[in-house]
């Protein structure tokens, strides 16, 4: 009798362990899936909902000495599943312009994305407020943060961070861009302002 009870207890433990491992495995698979993503520095017409949301916007960030960089840009990347890994499956780029502390232009050109360093998907954006989305499926808008390695046409290199804090985003994500260009750190993200068409970004999960 005791032997039978022991066998039943052992079987119950095995079944419980199997169920736990199955749940953990499913959660890991869900959080570690490969994502095909489009990113954009957007134009939000009127600087408020419903927009529309168009490609071709601009966003700025400042360096500690008061100088500023303004970027346009868009592209795609494939974010591999698991461990927030990087990828060379990237496209896109944009334009850049730098300004001194007084606001005078000091240079301009283009840049190209060469690598995805990391992408952290936060969540899909909430359906309200409603937007007209002229880029991709409005229901596939996403919040999160992408870190991209970029090559400037003047020979300098940089690391571009694109943050999207749209409707329904959890706290802690900035909205806009931050980048390096050579040794210079343009890390003072210029936030969007209501009614102003600037300093906004978006991700779309393509699949």
What is each stretch, according to the model?
Residues 2-15:
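Bacterial N-terminal signal peptides that target proteins for export
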Residues 8, 25-29:
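Alpha-helical segments embedded in low-complexity/disordered contexts
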Residues 12-24:
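Bacterial N-terminal signal peptides
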Residues 28-105, 186-207:
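N-terminal segment immediately downstream of the Sec signal-peptide cleavage site
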Residues 61-161:
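Predominantly extracellular/secreted and cell-surface proteins with exposed
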Residues 155-207:
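A eukaryote-biased signal for long
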């Amino acid at each position: 009798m005791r032997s039978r009870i022991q066998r039943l207890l052992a079987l119950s433990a095995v079944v419980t362990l199997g169920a736990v491992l199955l749940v953990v495995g499913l959660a890991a698979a869900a959080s570690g899936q490969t994502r095909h993503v489009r990113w954009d520095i957007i134009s939000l017409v009127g600087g408020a909902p419903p927009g529309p949301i168009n490609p071709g916007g601009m966003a700025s960030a400042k360096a500690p000495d008061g100088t500023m960089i303004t970027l346009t840009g868009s592209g795609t990347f494939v974010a591999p599943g698991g461990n927030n890994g990087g990828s060379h499956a990237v496209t896109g780029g944009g334009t850049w312009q730098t300004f001194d502390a007084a606001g005078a232009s000091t240079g301009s050109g283009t840049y190209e994305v060469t690598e995805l360093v990391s992408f952290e998907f936060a969540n899909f954006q909430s359906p309200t407020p409603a937007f007209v989305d002229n880029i991709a499926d409005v229901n596939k808008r996403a919040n999160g943060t992408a870190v991209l390695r970029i090559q400037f046409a003047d020979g300098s290199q940089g690391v571009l961070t694109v943050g999207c804090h749209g409707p329904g985003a959890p706290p802690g994500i900035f909205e806009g861009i931050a980048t390096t260009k050579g040794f210079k750190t343009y890390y003072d993200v210029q936030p969007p302002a209501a009614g102003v068409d600037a300093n906004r970004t978006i991700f779309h999960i393509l699949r």
